[in-house]
Each structure stands twice: as structure tokens, then as C-alpha cells.
Swiss-Prot record:
Protein name: F-box only protein 7
Residues covered by region (Disordered): 85-144, 483-522
Lineage, highest ranks first: Eukaryota, Metazoa, Chordata, Craniata, Vertebrata
Assigned keywords, A-Z: Cytoplasm, Disease variant, Methylation, Mitochondrion, Neurodegeneration, Nucleus, Parkinson disease, Parkinsonism, Ubl conjugation pathway
Species, as recorded: Homo sapiens
Chain intervals for the UniProt region annotation (Ubiquitin-like): 1-88
Length: 522
């Protein structure tokens, strides 16, 4: 049974696999899948209603006994006074994992808005925005035949542009009440018991953002390494792609209220101590909120990210390259991974693919799942809950081909305009019925600026009718007969009216009276 669940004026699909689901089954699926996806704790109390007024009780009762069938709208009312996450609309994308494609999760600091009775609308249909990403499919790799998605899956998708995920992608972008999804996934997988464990999880994520790779083949992208906590001492080992032949080890030792982080470097079986940093867990961890929403546990992530990377990570990386006798490098290639991702996500997909063909380092950075997840959520809208092992780059490629082959994306043929309705129009058919510019006439940079149409005063009939330049006429153009600078020597035989005082036909004698200056206005 497929249902629609509405919370805070936003709607999501929910699949209930049981044959005869009960209200308890529905409540269990809401806790396990949707609440965690929205950034709430699984212990959050809520009420299930159909109209925001009458709560449904009796977990043993089947949904059919309440008249609920597939496709109905289920409304949720939160009972806990907790901040509500900034959740996207029903046509927006579901946020899943940043690096190992975990299930989506959001956590923001928005206050919970009031519920209002609204007529349920079909949230699975949306208007597709006709906006292409690029015109050449050859840059996406060899073409493959993909099976078309089912009609039911397409019913839950609405394409659009201009949407950006509201969650922070890096720790340096975090604000109060918002943490990266990768930090939330790491914290949930680490089973933290105190503030020291939570701080080590954050340190591990900062090392991953800097481009360090956990040592060991079984280390996953968004899970803590094995044996990272032994006898109260934390030990993390890493390698960096820019420093091949070396390994770095972080040994974190609790010392009273502090945690001392010692960074050591191992090159050719020789261990060197490089940097040491002391951190106060209470400055970045809320002890009284451990086990609750991850967004409420961490604080001042921007400060810790700047402090940890500037005083330990980047000096360690520079010292490693110097110890390996590697030349100093500069430019985009040697920027930290987090800066590369922040630059790449500002580009269009075609530019990202072009950068991936430059060198191996840029190819590795441009294939980061975190980046392609961001690009997919930015350029498409998909409310489908994705599995953990989603290939975001391949999914982007598939959706791009699907949108390009859609008939909605075709351009409309522009036809020439009809004959002008004004009589004696000098040129009824414009010489270029298909303007080269997409801007309307009269806009700076449009067709009007490239070929301005000025009024032609040589013909008294069409002198006030704008045309595309000089047009042939039966009347000669108005030009000076003698001196182009001085006044005209005589009246113009073409234009009507009386001549001036210097014409061949002067004014009549005034019989001694002064000339009235008002005659020229009468």
C-alpha cells in the first residue's frame, strides 16, 4: 500500500509492504523511515490523523477499518516541542547520504510552523521545467540503453531548476541547529557514549573533508575505522593521495577536561612527530543532549573546522610533502578537497566533466559522490527515497537522458510575423523574421540595439512610421541645398508652410511696425 504522509505542509510517499497493514505497522514505518529522514529522533511523539483534528487510536486496528486505501493522505501532528527541520517540498529531492549513499536526513533550526487545514492535493505531480543542462551527450561517456522507469515512479518525480539543498555540505558551512548529513551518519554509526567520543567522530570527519583516506581496505567512507577506540585512547590512521609513500596517525588522549591530539608522520618506517593540538570538548559538544538529535549535540562547527584545519591538518600536509622532497604545487589541483567541492558545485555539469578530463586528481575529486548528490538535487527534483548504495553520477546521467528525450523539452518553431496593419508601411515583412537575440526588442543587448530602427523624415507620409532604415520613396530626402552648416537659402518646395526671414520670399512689409515675435507660435 502506497500512502502520502503530510507534515508541516509538505508531503512524502510512504510504502507499507504488509498485506493488511494495521495502524501499528504504519506508526512503525513512520518512525523507522520518515522521521529519521526529516531530521527527527525516532523517539519523537506524533499523532496520526486524517484531517488534523481527529486522532487515530488503536494500533491493532487495520487501516481498512478507518477507510484508508492506497493513495490516501495521512497527516501527522508532532507532540514534542522541538525545533522543526527545514524540510523541502514534496517535489523536492529526498536527501540521502553524502558519501556512502545512506538514507536521507535533514536537521535545521527552523521553528515548527502552525498546521492549517488544507484540501489535499496531489503532491506527486508537478510541472516540469523545460531547462536543459547541456546539448552534447558525448561528454557523459558511452551511451547505454536504460530501461524506462515505471509509470508509478515517474508519477512521483517533477523536474525543475533553481533548487538547492538547504542542509550544509561541510562542517565549515554549519550553523546553529544544522549539521552535515555525513556527520549525522558518522555519529549514528559510532555509538558514542560521551562527549569525547562525539568529538573524535567530528575530528575524523574533518580529516575526510581535507582529503585524507582512512587506512585499511575495510574502512568505509561514512563509518568509523575499526579499533578507533581502545582503552580510552583514540587512534586514527590515514593516507593522502598527494603524499604517496607516507601515512599519518592521529593519537587523541583525554587529559582532564581536554583532549590532546598528536599528529605523527611515518615515512620509510621512520616516525616523526609533527603537530599537537589541545581541544576542549565542552566548547563543541553539548553533554546534556547526547543521544538526541545530532543537530543539537554539536555547536560552533565553523570555529572547530577552521581551528583544526589551520593548526593541524594543512601544516601536516605541507610537512609531509616537504619530507618526501616533493615540489611545491599550487593551483586548483592542490586545493583541499573541501575547497574543490565548493568550487565544483558552483559549476554546471558540463564544466565538471571537462575538469575531470584534465588530470587524475581532478578526476578523483569530480567523481566524489557528495558532489554528484548535490548536483542531482540541484538540477532535478525527485522525492523518491534512495537506497544506500545509490550511484548519483549514473542516476544523474539517466535522468538527463530521460529529460532530453522528453517531448516537453523540444523548442517551439517561431513563424514570421504577419503583414503590418498600418497602411503604407515601408517594409511589411521584416528582413530577419528570426531575431538572433532571445531578448525582446528594446532591451539592452537585444535586436533593437544591434539594428535600431529610426524614423525617416524624408517622406511626409511615412516620416512618423518607424522602419528598418532608409527606404526608397517618391519624394527626395530632406537635405541642405547649399551650405550644410548655415541656414537654408530658400523655402523647401516639398514641406508646406511659410519661409523664414532669409528665404527668397521675405515677409510682407510691416509699414513701420516691429515684427511680432509671437507669429512663429501662431
Amino acid at each position: 500500500m502506497r500512502l502520502r504522509v503530510r507534515l508541516l505542509k509538505r508531503t512524502w510517499p510512504l510504502e507499507v509492504p504488509e498485506t493488511e497493514p494495521t495502524l501499528g505497522h504504519l506508526r512503525s514505518h513512520l518512525r523507522q523511515s520518515l522521521l529519521c529522514t526529516w531530521g527527527y529522533s525516532s523517539n519523537t511523539r506524533f499523532t496520526i490523523t486524517l484531517n488534523y483534528k481527529d486522532p487515530l487510536t488503536g494500533d491493532e486496528e487495520t487501516l481498512a477499518s478507518y477507510g484508508i486505501v492506497s493513495g490516501d493522505l495521512i497527516c501527522l501532528i508532532l507532540q514534542d516541542d522541538i525545533p522543526a527541520p527545514n524540510i523541502p517540498s514534496s517535489t523536492d529531492s529526498e536527501h540521502s547520504s553524502l558519501q556512502n549513499n545512506e538514507q536521507p536526513s535533514l536537521a535545521t533550526s527552523s521553528n515548527q510552523t502552525s498546521m492549517q487545514d488544507e484540501q489535499p492535493s496531489d503532491s506527486f505531480q508537478g510541472q516540469a521545467a523545460q531547462s536543459g543542462v547541456w546539448n552534447d551527450d558525448s561528454m557523459l561517456g558511452p551511451s547505454q540503453n536504460f530501461e524506462a522507469e515505471s509509470i508509478q515512479d515517474n508519477a512521483h518525480m517533477a523536474e525543475g531548476t533553481g533548487f538547492y539543498p538547504s542542509e550544509p555540505m561541510l562542517c565549515s558551512e554549519s550553523v546553529e541547529g544544522q549539521v552535515p548529513h555525513s556527520l549525522e551518519t558518522l555519529y549514528q554509526s559510532a555509538d558514542c557514549s560521551d562527549a569525547n567520543d562525539a568529538l573524535i567522530v567530528l575530528i575524523h570527519l574533518l580529516m575526510l573533508e581535507s582529503g585524507y583516506i582512512p587506512q585499511g581496505t575495510e574502512a568505509k567512507a561514512l563509518s568509523m575505522p575499526e579499533k578507533w577506540k581502545l582503552s580510552g585512547v583514540y587512534k586514527l590512521q590515514y593516507m593522502h593521495p598527494l603524499c604517496e609513500g607516507s601515512s599519518a596517525t592521529l593519537t587523541c588522549v583525554p587529559l582532564g577536561n581536554l583532549i590532546v591530539v598528536n599528529a605523527t608522520l611515518k615515512i620509510n618506517n621512520e616516525i616523526r612527530s609533527v603537530k599537537r593540538l589541545q581541544l576542549l570538548p565542552e566548547s563543541f559538544i553539548c553533554k546534556e543532549k547526547l543521544g538526541e538529535n545530532v543537530a543539537n549535540i554539536y555547536k560552533d562547527l565553523q570555529k572547530l573546522s577552521r581551528l583544526f584545519k589551520d593548526q593541524l591538518v594543512y601544516p601536516l600536509l605541507a610537512f609531509t610533502r616537504q619530507a618526501l622532497n616533493l615540489p611545491d604545487v599550487f593551483g586548483l589541483v592542490v586545493l583541499p578537497l573541501e575547497l574543490k567541492l565548493r568550487i565544483f558545485r558552483l559549476l554546471d555539469v558540463r564544466s565538471v566533466l571537462s575538469l575531470s578530463a584534465v588530470c587524475r586528481d581532478l578526476f578523483t575529486a569530480s567523481n566524489d559522490p557528495l558532489l554528484w548528490r548535490f548536483l542531482y538535487l540541484r538540477d532535478f527534483r525527485d522525492n523518491t527515497v534512495r537506497v544506500q548504495d545509490t550511484d548519483w553520477k549514473e542516476l544523474y546521467r539517466k535522468r538527463h537522458i530521460q529529460r532530453k528525450e522528453s517531448p516537453k523539452g523540444r523548442f517551439v518553431m517561431l513563424l514570421p510575423s504577419s503583414t503590418h496593419t498600418i497602411p503604407f508601411y515601408p517594409n511589411p515583412l521584416h528582413p530577419r523574421p528570426f531575431p538572433s537575440s532571445r531578448l525582446p526588442p528594446g532591451i539592452i543587448g537585444g535586436e533593437y540595439d544591434q539594428r535600431p530602427t529610426l524614423p525617416y523624415v524624408g517622406d511626409p507620409i511615412s516620416s512618423l512610421i518607424p522602419g528598418p532604415g532608409e527606404t526608397p520613396s517618391q519624394f527626395p530626402p530632406l537635405r541642405p541645398r547649399f551650405d550644410p552648416v548655415g541656414p537654408l537659402p530658400g523655402p523647401n518646395p516639398i514641406l508646406p508652410g511659410r519661409g523664414g526671414p532669409n528665404d527668397r520670399f521675405p515677409f510682407r512689409p510691416s509699414r513701420g511696425r516691429p515684427t511680432d515675435g509671437r507669429l512663429s507660435f501662431m
